[in-house]
A protein has these predicted regions:
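Acidic, mature catalytic/reactive cores of soluble proteins
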Residues: 1-462
Length: 462
C-alpha cells in the first residue's frame, strides 16, 4: 500500500505513443525545478561550491549528494535526514529509463497486472486514477520502427525474411530533438510541451496500436520490431514473420478492462494523430475484409501514424467517447475471433508461436533498380502468406486461462495439455514446450540448446 500508484504510473508512462517501451529501467532521479531556489539552497548548505551547484541544479540522487559530501570531506551541521528534508522539500521525482535495444512484443502485457493490483488495494480511487489523474506521459525513444518496404527483404539464398526493423539510433530524430539517448525523453508537441493523458487514455492508445499488429491470418501479434517475447531463445522468430497468440490473449484482457471501466461522463485526451488512426481502424474493422487485407491496411495506417509522430505530436485532442466505445467493441470482436481461430488451429490447445512464409511477392523498385532496405538487402512487397504452428508451448494456454469463461473448456484444454508432450510424465513436471527436434536453428538459439537447458523443453521459471 505504501507504494500507492508509483509503480503503475511509472511503467504506464514508459509505454510510448507507438505502444512499445524502453528496455532498461534506471533508478529515479530528483530535480528542483525552481533553479533560483536551488542556487540559494546550495549557498545555504554548501557555500559557493560549484560542484554542488551543478549537481543540485540538474538531475540528482541522494547518493550523489552523500558521496560528494564524503569525497570532499565537507562538514554539514545537519543530520542526513534533516539535510534531505531541506533538499527534497521542493524536489520532483523523475522516472528514468533508456531504450537499450529492441522492442519485445510482451513487455506491455504486465501493465494490466499493475493496474489490477492497484485496483485491488484502492478500489475507491480507481475512477479518479482512470480519468481525473492526467499526469501519465509517453516515453520517447531515439528509435524509429521502419515500414515494411524497408524490412521485408530477399536474402541471398532467395528467402523472404523480415530483418533490420529498427532505425537505431534514429540520428535525424536525435539531432532534431537534441535527445540524450541514455536518459529519459518524453513525447512533446511542437512547442516542447510534454504530452500527458489519464490512465484510460493511455491504455486506449496501447490497445489501438496493438490491434494493428495482428498477423496476416489475424491470430497472433507480430514480432515486427526485431525481438520476440520474454523467451529470448526464440530470437529467430521476428525474421520468420513470427507472431504470438499469448499477446493476443493479453490484448483482449486490456480491451475487456477498458470496456468494463468505460464511462462517457469523462473524456480522454490522446495525440491528434491517434484520432485519425482510430477512425481509419474503425472503418476497416466495420468492413467484411479478409485477414490479409486487414493486415495490409492496418499496417499501412500504423506506418502513417508512426511517421506522423516520429519527432513530435501536433498536440493532444479530446477524442469522442462514442468513437472510443465503438472502437473498443470492434477491437473486442476482432480479438474474440482471433482467439477462437487460434484455438481451432491448435485443435483444442492454444498455440503460442506462429511463423509465416511469403508465398507471393513483388520486388520493390527505386529509380528502376531494386530498393535496398535497412538490412542491406533488396526489399519486396508481400502479397500472400502461408502459416504454420510451432510445437506447442505452455505460455499461451496458461495465459488463456485468465480469459476463458467456460470451466468445461478449461478442463478440456488442461487434459489435452497433460496428455501432450508439454507434460513430462517421468518428472511430473510441465515443460516450456513440446519437442523441438523437427525445427531448424532458424527459429532461434533455443533450438541449439540441450533439452532441459534454459528455455528448451525445460521446467523453467522466468
Amino acid at each position: 500500500p505504501l507504494i500507492e500508484d508509483f509503480n503503475m504510473k511509472m511503467f504506464v508512462s514508459f509505454i510510448q505513443a507507438d505502444g512499445y517501451n524502453p528496455l532498461s529501467i534506471n533508478g529515479s532521479t530528483f530535480e528542483i525545478e525552481d533553479k533560483e531556489y536551488a542556487r540559494n539552497l546550495v549557498t545555504e548548505l554548501f557555500g559557493d561550491d560549484e560542484e554542488f551547484q551543478h549537481i543540485i541544479g540538474n538531475h540528482f540522487t541522494p547518493g550523489s549528494i552523500i558521496n560528494t559530501i564524503a569525497n570532499k570531506k565537507i562538514k554539514v551541521d545537519l543530520t542526513d535526514d534533516e539535510l534531505f528534508d531541506k533538499i527534497f522539500k521542493y524536489a520532483k521525482q523523475n522516472y528514468e529509463a533508456h531504450f537499450a535495444e529492441g522492442y519485445w512484443i510482451d513487455h506491455w502485457t504486465y501493465i494490466l497486472d499493475l493496474v489490477e493490483n492497484y485496483q485491488a488495494v484502492y478500489p475507491d480511487k480507481m475512477k479518479e486514477k482512470l480519468f481525473l489523474d492526467k499526469e501519465f506521459m509517453y516515453f520517447d525513444s531515439p528509435v524509429y520502427i521502419l515500414p515494411r518496404d524497408e524490412k521485408i527483404c530477399l536474402t541471398k539464398d532467395n528467402k523472404i525474411r523480415r530483418f533490420g526493423s529498427l532505425l537505431h539510433n534514429d540520428e535525424e530524430k536525435v539531432e532534431k530533438l537534441d535527445m540524450n539517448v541514455y536518459a529519459s525523453n518524453w513525447l512533446k508537441d511542437e512547442n516542447e510541451n510534454t504530452i500527458k493523458t489519464n490512465l484510460f487514455g493511455k491504455l486506449f492508445v496501447l490497445a489501438t496500436t496493438k490491434i494493428a499488429n495482428l498477423d496476416p491470418y489475424g491470430l497472433g501479434l507480430e514480432m515486427e520490431a526485431d525481438k520476440p517475447g520474454w523467451n529470448d531463445a526464440m530470437n529467430g522468430l521476428p525474421g520468420l514473420f513470427g507472431s504470438g497468440v499469448s499477446e493476443t490473449i493479453e490484448l483482449k484482457r486490456v480491451v475487456t478492462f477498458l470496456q468494463n471501466n468505460f464511462d462517457s461522463n469523462y473524456d480522454i485526451d490522446v495525440p491528434i494523430e491517434l484520432v485519425k488512426f482510430v477512425e481509419k481502424l474503425v472503418n476497416l474493422l466495420s468492413q467484411d475484409t479478409s485477414d490479409f487485407v486487414y493486415w495490409d491496411k492496418a499496417n499501412t495506417y500504423k506506418e502513417i501514424y508512426r511517421k506522423e509522430i516520429r519527432f513530435y505530436t501536433l498536440g493532444n485532442k479530446s477524442i469522442s467517447m462514442d468513437l472510443v466505445k465503438e472502437a473498443l467493441n470492434l477491437y473486442a470482436k476482432k480479438l474474440d475471433l482471433a482467439i477462437e481461430k487460434a484455438y481451432e488451429f491448435g485443435n483444442g490447445i492454444y498455440p503460442t508461436y506462429l511463423v509465416y512464409e511469403v508465398t507471393k511477392f513483388e520486388e520493390i523498385l527505386e529509380n528502376g533498380k531494386a530498393k535496398i532496405g535497412n538490412y542491406g538487402l533488396p526489399t519486396v512487397k508481400a502479397l500472400e502468406f502461408s502459416m504454420r504452428l510451432l510445437p506447442f508451448y505452455l505460455e499461451a494456454p496458461a495465459r488463456a486461462l485468465k480469459v476463458m469463461d467456460n470451466p468445461i473448456e478449461k478442463r478440456k484444454m488442461f487434459e489435452k495439455i497433460k496428455a501432450s508432450n508439454i507434460y513430462d510424465y517421468d518428472l511430473k513436471f510441465y515443460k516450456t514446450s513440446e519437442f523441438l527436434d523437427q525445427e531448424s536453428n532458424e527459429i532461434g538459439r533455443g533450438r541449439s540448446f540441450t533439452k532441459g537447458w534454459q528455455e528448451r523443453e525445460s521446467n523453467f521459471l522466468h
